[in-house]
Amino acid sequence: MRATIPFPDMSPEIFSISVFGFDLALRWYALAYIVGIVLGWRLVLRAVKRPDLWRDDQPVMTAAQIEDLLTWVIVGVILGGRLGYVFFYQPGYYLQNPSEILAVWQGGMAFHGGLLGVIAAGFIYTWRHRIARLSAADIMALGVPPGLLLGRIANFINAELWGRATDMPWGVAFPGAAAQDCAGVEGICARHPSQLYEAGLEGLILGALLIWLVWKKAALKTPGYVAGVFFAGYGVSRFFVEFFRQPDAQFITDGNPLGLAWHINGWGLTMGQCLSLPMILLGIWLIARARHAA
């Protein structure tokens, strides 16, 4: 097995400065979060400023409400993403070390947890302001793919969340002892750049599909449809990529080398697949409901 693509020599930090003895660094991952949120916010604002895209030419939210909701979304992403990682992937460790649960600067965020955080934030906000929830879910879903695209690219730059070992010509030799520890492989180990697979499927393709549905097919006139396509599209994309993505180390044992979170007689699902199945089912239900209501 050989790597045909060497990992690019890039630092996770864009730059670092020292202020009063404290080192402050801007990392690609943080920049991806910031730019992704801003791009999603601008995309949503464009949609709410187009009354013709909405049922009865009435956007469900004003531009001011979108900006207000953005604060709730940011809090939901950070808290949900962190708590999702803690309880979905390493509950035992963090229950023994509760002081590290909120140490987000040490790394460890989960998309499914962040999604639950955003859903909770959106539910509370729409309840307080008496906003139609399905239409609000549509507009929130529209703003997610830019963050997914940039976030997964940042994962690649950070050389984290890499894929399983492969002999395909686009395999990448990620740095680090863990990335190069491949069972049965001598010499350099090439891995699937699964972060880029996710960036393309969940970010670029899914984002383009949602934009096409909103601006070309007036999908916002059918509440719940855009959100349904997002849930189903992300769920299917993530479920597929999990076949190529290296599972978290805590799930891998001698009797479970594939790192399956649930398995019977060698067959099973990774944690990412287990969490994606409910998304697929919810997405299908929302799409069917929206079509029936139309």
UniProtKB/Swiss-Prot annotation:
One of its GO terms (cellular component) is plasma membrane. The chain crosses the membrane at residues 19-39, 69-89, 101-121, 139-159, 195-215, 224-244, 267-287. Its main location: membrane. Keywords: Cell inner membrane, Cell membrane, Membrane, Transferase, Transmembrane, Transmembrane helix. InterPro entries: Lgt (IPR001640). Its EC number is 2.5.1.145. Pathway: Protein modification; lipoprotein biosynthesis (diacylglyceryl transfer). This is Phosphatidylglycerol--prolipoprotein diacylglyceryl transferase.
